[in-house]
């Protein structure tokens, strides 16, 4: 009799715990925007549903589409790699919850060693000035010794699909910046072929394009400013030094997935996009020279180092320093933003709770669960700002 009562008590307590651990309701939120964020959203929303019971629907139509849909109140949240420059919504907060490198992927099957590119050469390729892979300007950068940082890493255990898995992530110092264990001095000598360059670019309104164009202008400002004099916009073809109609070797594509697919389809192809799109297509990516003279691969650690030198604005957006000597910095790293409604928008408070929980999950859990996607675990002052912005979602 006593045993039966004890079992009944345990069952009641267990049932109460399960109920209290479950969400009060299972809700659904809808988002729209950047293809830059799509790889991490696609894998992480499944885990979010398992952990919370809530469903996230996301349509990746580009940052411009996300900003438009958010402005028109068609979604519960947006995602954009760039801030609004006009047509501001009446109620808006930026939550910097995504960060990753914009990689330069290429298709040169005969080249078996990494390719190294300087900001000047990248500008000359994407402006149409360099049209062949064995151009002397590319060969000069890839001739001789280059300095490459090696970042410290550690293994952690996280739960994915209900199972404990081991992941490798960068080791951070007290300031939240990645630790560099050493520098490798590499003899750069790829056998660059006599193959025409075909440039794949985003033809849609794209925050990824805008951030890439900011790099092309910012990193070449000063002595090389003539290489990329135009101000960055979300439309690549509107921001090139010379109209693309002057060239036969430029191919537009709608979205990062199609840019990467285009590069894969053409020997000699080159394009830009979030690093996982090229990894998924088994394409190599270039190491990019930073202002300290180092050549850095597109990685979460290099992105973290670069963003750590940026200036955080009051609205949650970030200005990045292209001409600042930051050890280990990958200079085409970018923060990307959740577009969210603050309390003043008077949105459904229950949905707002889900939006806040989703952005917290993106900020704190997703990069650790899926480091292979290349996204940076945001830390330090930018993390604090992201948390403060998320707290405004009510």
Segments (PLM) and residue ranges:
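Cleavable N-terminal signal peptides
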Residues: 11-14, 24
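Flexible loop/hinge segments at secondary-structure junctions
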Residues: 25-394
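Bacterial N-terminal signal peptides that target proteins for export
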Residues: 1-10
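Sec/Tat signal peptide C-region and signal peptidase I cleavage site
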Residues: 18-26
